[in-house]
Amino acid sequence: MKKEIILDLCGGTGSWAKPYKEAGYKVITVTLPDYDIRKTILKDGHITFVGKDKSHMVVAKAVYGILAAPPCTMFSFARTKARTPRDLKQGMECVRACLDIIWSIMEVKQETKFKKCPLQFWALENPYHGFLPKFLGKPAFTFDPWKFGDGYQKKTAIWGYFNEPIKKPVPMTDEVKAHLKGNRVMNTVKFNYLKSKDIHPEVFGKFDRQTRLAITPAGFANAFYKANP
């Protein structure tokens, strides 16, 4: 049984890290309301995640891999009707916190002699159509959920150091062919156009719409795990 530690930063429902957890890895999900990533303490080779009434300490050199999904609220181009103005400085607070954790572990475990990356992998996710690419530059990998077997469009960007997952597009069925007559892409529905009940319907009623919007599609999550075990 795997004992390696996976940090699931701003993990929400834990959907991206789910395949690792099911495979026996020790997944530590750092997300609100349990922990505020911005209050993380990095000191003496240890990482302490701080919550309102609890904390959790991790030895930096024990971390195997990191998945990070900082909130896209302030970055997404879809933010057009929000009551509060877009605040990119506020949005970057969680991004900086995630990167600080990643970099601190890379520094602690540096083994120049063996020319190996301290972390086996790290990846940071956010919508492709947003402002974060203007801060972090060109992403290492981009995908739409339909390219991994999930039936919708939501172009996503991934930055980091990892093996690229193998894409497995939605099968070209007669139904898909019929829809394609008026569309230039495999999928016919953009994520933002889905009815609320159709956004990850498997957890409709359990999580609110905003939480379900942030769920990592299962097809991609499984493919990422297989490429980065």
Describe the residue ranges of each PLM region.
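Conserved active-site and SAM-binding loop architecture
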Residues: 1-229
